[in-house]
């Protein structure tokens, strides 16, 4: 389903857990595998004939998204402003998206994009960190910044009457950061601490190595800087990254919710019109690894093995992308999926396996992740690859597919139900160069996906012999189990 750039595994897991109720309800109605089919029945009357068994109502037909009317402005310096009236709650969501992130990091600059983003609200030429936080709080909100693979977002949500001044505040943070040395030292220390925590978690260790194997020397391969690299960074290094990669040609301002459009437009023009255009966004698609490899990382004494396996797939510009998302949901990307039903519900090898399609600009991969019992590592891989192979050979039933289609369409609807969700979806279109019809026709494409489409997608793109496989676990226990998966014959 449409998203912005890729989310970490933990975020995906939280999203899946949040949607459990919806997935179960949809699967139950539509007969998806793994669904709880038992219905609570009222007690029979003490006398006379029993009441007829109650049945849930038939599922409704998912409806297409009606994209809110938007107004798009282009300033003389190339910056875009997108104004979207939405909802009735008197709040406005403001998001400035700048097309920079990991993609612009040099080999000796891993993590600079996130350090730069974190420093944006730590002080400007006219505001210190305390004043920035206080101003945002006075407007009924807060401001934050984060960097991803291709986009850095500066965003916040405020009361309707403060939308225009909040735009002015966001402009100051983006255009005039001062990168104060005392705040930088604290932010860098926090980054070192977060890195240490991440490198103690097998899921992050596996994800980092998976990306490194998949992308080689490309910036997308480098998720974490070393502690030595982080220690060596200075405010001057971050300032140079900002100067090179922040500019109007790379920026789009999204304002979604209830707001005074004339006041917001005026504020945007006043705050951003004099911003230098800067360079065009970097577009550098990777040459992702497309052949089987196995990496085993030793974690002595571990009672679980963490599995990451995946393969390059078409990006959102492909005509097959929506069907690929449906295929992912059926195979491993939902709680009613085949892999989850197999290794979680039936076998009990794991608690929370999941798969996803992860996207960047002109790039995507499909990946399955699972933390499995150590002595069932090989058996888990056998089952995962077995489910992939089964779907490549045999189309799912129409009934099974319909449950998944309803799930995917339902999640899509939920994602478009908030101000931030609408902004993220519009950003997704812009980052991937897609028309509005991509969103307004999404549900129709989901529901039009046929069982044979799913089988064809799996056969075409999810070939086990092309998959990158990373396992983090107790080598003495796991090595012999995973050895047969090092190579495979098509």
Task: Describe every region a protein language model picked out.
Residues 39-63, 252-255, 370, 402-490:
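C-terminal regions of mature proteins
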Residues 133-138, 178-196, 260, 279-292, ...:
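Acidic/histidine-enriched alpha-helical segments
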Residues 122-126, 156-188, 334, 354, ...:
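M16/insulysin-pitrilysin zinc metalloprotease superfamily fold
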Residues 44-55, 166, 198-247, 268, ...:
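Scaffold signal of the M16-like zinc-metallopeptidase fold and its non-catalytic homologs
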Residues 93-160, 200, 222-224, 334-349, ...:
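M16/MPP (pitrilysin/insulinase) zinc-metallopeptidase core fold and M16-derived inactive scaffolds
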Residues 42-58, 217, 252-315, 471-490:
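An aromatic/glycine/proline-enriched structural segment found at the starts
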Residues 27-44:
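Signal peptide processing junction and immediate N-terminal pro/mature segment
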